[in-house]
Amino acid sequence: MFIINGEHWRVVLCSVHHPMLIRSDGSLSVGACDDASKTIYLNGNLRGDFLKKVLCHELTHAAMFSYNVELTIEQEELLAELIATYGEEIIDITNVLFYKLKERLA
């Protein structure tokens, strides 16, 4: 369990054919974020870097729900994918630059 903006969320590893991983068109998803139950569902077969990317993508959805960020579905998916793909690099660069600036300003 984890908390975002005071809301308790959980992560569930589930079967490939779990109802929450089946899209409305019948295709399968590797992850889903359900605001109503405050649950992130992940395909239990995911491993390694892809698991991390899908988890980050779904956590971004959870954060948007928890902070009442209202975007179109297309914008929401774009933001989640941006953070899942490049977020770690952005944070790493931010940390390096911040510490350099902090030392110069001290």
Show where each model-derived region lies:
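Metalloprotease/metallohydrolase-associated module, dominated by Zn2+-dependent proteases
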Residues: 1-50, 66-106
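Active-site recognition of the HExxH zinc-binding catalytic motif
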Residues: 53-65
